[in-house]
Curated annotation (Swiss-Prot):
Free-text comment on the cofactor: Binds 2 heme b groups non-covalently.
Domain DOMON: 49-164
Cofactor: heme b
Main function: May act as a catecholamine-responsive trans-membrane electron transporter.
TM helices/strands, residue ranges: 210-230, 241-261, 280-300, 316-336, 349-369
Identification of the protein by name: Cytochrome b561 and DOMON domain-containing protein At5g35735
GO biological process: cellular response to hypoxia
UniProt keyword terms in alphabetical order: Electron transport, Heme, Iron, Membrane, Metal-binding, Signal, Transmembrane, Transmembrane helix, Transport
Region (Disordered): 172-207, 376-404
Domain remarks in the Swiss-Prot or TrEMBL record: DOMON domain could bind catecholamines and thereby could regulate the cytochrome b561 domain function. DOMON domain could bind one heme b.
Length: 404
């Protein structure tokens, strides 16, 4: 090797290294040139999804001209960027949305105020003025342009950006993992500072999922199964049915209270967001279930003159709780908007429980009537009077009068 080439080679390597470090140290948004010769005072490489935000803040009139860029987009995807004045979650976000209109085959932009987790990004006005809204899709890169008329409390705000599929001409749910759950942060249009959101939205999603699972299992599965134990097992085994009934109901109540508490926590963490029907049904369920628990403490003896009234109360509140719980679980599905498989999985559980009822109801009546025709008790002989619900601890007229 020619030794005279070594210094030149070393110098070239050093220069190449410095060039790479310089390019890597320079914000990618600073190197972008817009085809329409627009120029912006500040820009930020956003922390997720490979997106960029360019803006110019006009302090005199309180407006911000922005350009949001998202590369690697297909014609069957939607892209959105927005501000949330109260939190880093999706609900409450004032968004700019862009995707290809399948009817006109034109790439369009519009505004959408996100009011629920099941949103389809419907067109709606925002809490602040927007002018000059437009969007382009060039070589797989979406750019949304707009001028925002911001109040002082929005000069520093939470920003969120997202991408998802378009299905049948309508924006569908985005992915709930990876960068899609990290695409939020803070933006200060005046100072030009932007920071990552720290994954808060992912934590909220986990809390919502936990809330949904706890309530679906407790109110939607364990409670109905506990009622079925009391209604259908009593003719076969006493006091086994009683212990199973109590075990299912108490387990359902404990898990349900945990789910209810997570719902309260989610509500407190989401100011300005309210699902009044879902919340009110949840409060009613908690109240009814708590009344059922305390009712057990004042349950009259089987031969007490008020036992019949207690049974009517216990049945009415119990079945009302089960019906309301199923209704509220589907309300929760509408709010959380999970993949369809979860909704269908719960529907499958309800169908299974319903099939069990259709089989056990006539079977129970058959056993009750046969025992009655033979002059015997309609329930299995109890080992203790505390498990019996008939008048004076003897027979009942059928399964409708049985309870814990």
């Amino acid at each position: 090797m020619d030794r005279t080439q070594s210094p030149k080679t070393a110098l070239f390597a050093v220069l190449a290294t410095l060039l790479v470090l310089t390019v890597n140290g320079q914000s990618l948004c600073n190197t972008h040139r817009f085809t329409n010769n627009l120029a912006f005072a500040d820009c930020s490489d956003l922390s997720a999804l490979g997106s960029f935000l360019h803006w110019t803040y006009n302090e005199q009139n309180g407006t911000v001209s922005i350009a949001y860029r998202h590369p690697g987009t297909s014609a069957s995807s939607w892209v959105a960027w927005g501000l949330n004045p109260s939190s880093t979650q999706m609900v409450g976000t004032q968004a700019l949305v862009a995707f290809t209109n399948t009817t006109t085959n034109q790439f369009q932009a519009y505004t959408s105020s996100v009011s629920s987790y099941g949103t389809r990004l419907e067109r709606s006005s925002l809490s602040f003025g927007v002018s000059g809204l437009s969007a382009t899709l060039v070589s797989g890169e979406v750019t949304i342009f707009a001028t925002l008329e911001l109040s002082p409390n929005l000069i520093t705000a939470n920003q969120l950006w997202q991408v998802g599929p378009v299905v049948n001409g309508v924006p569908a749910s985005h992915q709930t993992s990876g960068d899609n759950m990290r695409s939020s942060g803070r933006i200060d249009f005046r100072t030009g500072q932007a920071s990552a959101g720290g994954g808060g939205s992912g934590d909220r999603l986990r809390k919502r999922n936990t809330h949904g699972v706890l309530n679906a299992v407790s109110w939607g599965v364990l409670m109905p199964m506990g009622a079925m134990m009391a209604r259908y097992m009593k003719v076969f085994a006493d006091p086994t049915w009683f212990y199973l009934h109590i075990a299912f109901q108490v387990s359902g109540y404990v898990i349900g209270v945990a789910g209810w508490a997570t719902g309260i926590k989610l509500g407190n963490d989401s100011p300005g967001t309210s699902y009044s029907t879902h919340r009110n049904l949840g409060i009613a369920l908690f109240t009814f279930a708590t009344l059922q628990v305390f009712a057990l403490l004042v349950r009259p003896k089987p031969d007490h003159k008020y036992r019949t009234y207690w049974n009517v109360y216990h049945h009415t509140v119990g079945y009302t709780t089960i019906i309301l719980s199923i209704v509220n679980i589907f309300k929760g599905f509408d709010i959380l908007d999970p993949e369809d498989k979860w909704r269908w999985a719960y529907i499958g559980i309800l169908i299974f429980l319903g099939a069990c009822v259709l089989i056990l109801e006539p079977l129970t009546w058959f056993i009750v009537l046969r025992r009655k025709s033979r002059g015997g008790n309609t329930v299995a002989a109890p080992t203790s009077s505390k498990y019996s619900n008939g008048v004076n601890g003897t027979t009942t007229t059928g399964p409708h009068h049985q309870d814990a």
